[in-house]
A protein has these predicted regions:
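N-terminal Rossmann-like FAD-binding beta1-loop-alpha1 element of flavoenzymes
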Residues: 3-31
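Conserved structural-core and active-site-/substrate-pathway-adjacent residues in large, well-folded domains
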Residues: 8, 19, 55, 109-113, ...
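Residues in the short beta-alpha loop(s) of Rossmann-like NAD(P)-binding domains
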Residues: 35
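Active-site-adjacent segment of FAD-dependent monooxygenases/related oxidoreductases
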Residues: 40-120, 134
Length: 220
């Protein structure tokens, strides 16, 4: 029966980063994903300070900074009028070298991670699905569905469930996924807009009449 130390299920940002960390530490994982190709839309846009700090250890932070867009502050609007401005550098400049919000779309992030993994000899096995697995105590035996429809049994010391909200890894373990669904309907669109040039800051419109500006003490 084929084996490898770690089987990673799911090749989104979480699975890709885990695979990259392991590969750099000398552990070559097997990385599978049931989709035919990586994402082609932006989806999640923001890379936060802690992620950039971790990316710096993987020699990725500078690339993300060069390819993305730095957002130094956010402006809050109510009914078409500006009400408040939150300066990220003012809040966290003494806590991190990345005291800003970095815009770097998820699809570009995934392509960057995939390219770095391939440099280390790890590739994503697409259209390969985890059907189930059983825990043998000192190892896990995974049942996989391959792209050609054949089934494969694979043994690993660890299985990492990076397969999202409907994770079969988590379901097999009997673990719940607490939380709820927003009642509101949200749209995410990638568009090229025209109009007055913005100053590079993020703008957020709030559907409320009154806005209280909170006092933020980042020393606590």
């Amino acid at each position: 029966m084929p084996t490898r130390d770690v089987l990673i299920v799911g090749a989104g940002p979480t699975g890709l980063v885990l695979a990259l960390w392991l590969a750099r530490l000398g552990v070559k994982p097997r990385l599978i994903d049931k989709t035919a190709e990586p994402g082609t839309t932006s989806r999640a846009l923001a890379v936060h300070a802690r992620t950039l700090e971790l990316y710096r250890q993987l020699d990725l932070a500078q690339v993300v900074l060069e390819r993305g867009h730095k957002v130094p502050a956010i402006r809050l609007w109510v009914k078409g009028e500006p009400r408040a401005r939150i300066d990220f550098e003012e809040i966290a400049s003494d806590l991190t070298p990345y005291s800003f919000l970095q815009i770097f779309p998820q699809d570009e992030n995934e392509r960057l991670l995939i390219a770095r993994l391939e440099e280390l000899g790890v590739s994503v096995e697409r259209r390969t699905e985890l059907i189930g697995y059983r825990d043998e105590g000192d190892r896990a035996v995974a049942h996989l569905r391959l792209p050609d429809g054949r089934d494969e049994t694979w043994e690993a010391a660890y299985i990492a469930g990076c397969d999202g909200a409907h994770s079969i890894v988590r379901q097999t373990m009997g673990m719940e996924f607490p939380g709820g669904t927003y009642r509101q309907l949200f749209y995410v669109a990638d568009v090229q807009a025209s109009g007055p040039a913005l100053d590079g800051e993020l703008r957020h419109t709030l559907p409320i009449d009154r806005l209280r500006k909170p006092r933020i003490d980042h020393r606590r």
